[in-house]
Amino acid sequence: GRGDLPAPGGLSWAGELAALSGYEAATGYGLVTHYYNMKNGLVPPGAVSLCTAPDYVAMRLCGLEKPRTHASLAASLGLFDLDAGSFDHAALARAGLPADMLPEAVRGEALLGETAGGLPVALPIGDNQAGFLGAAGRPDDVLLNLGTSSQLSALCPPSGCPEGLEPRPYIGGARLMTGAGLCG
């Protein structure tokens, strides 16, 4: 992807964003793509916001003009502080990324609004989190998901996630520990 392309300083675009922000950054993170697009003049003039596809669909279903995002989707964009439950504005500034382009990150689960017909629309959650919730979800469960990518996920113990596994926001303020890789 674009994040793996070489940037002028010798690093990849993802590597440059990681060096500037202090956060892990890889192709696939929304802010890696946005960083590349900004640096290469590809952000349309007048663009006011970015969000994930599920956030956009939910926003449109509710007739809203500004997206909101669950922490599980916000974290997938990158430069997200898990402890604060928000994007890291200092890291965004170091990378030259305007914070006002990002959706509001919402802690917890909530109704986003209603459709024009009055049907409730919940704030979407990440696919890894939704898969764990639907297929496992109990404290001692482990979910192995194999597809184009693979994920091994379990709830983090109260003492914290072990090294080598990625902590991801989950529902109810909990975190999933996830090991992920490509299968194909």
What spans do the regions from the language model cover?
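Glycine-rich phosphate-binding/catalytic subdomain of phosphoryl-transfer
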Residues: 1-184
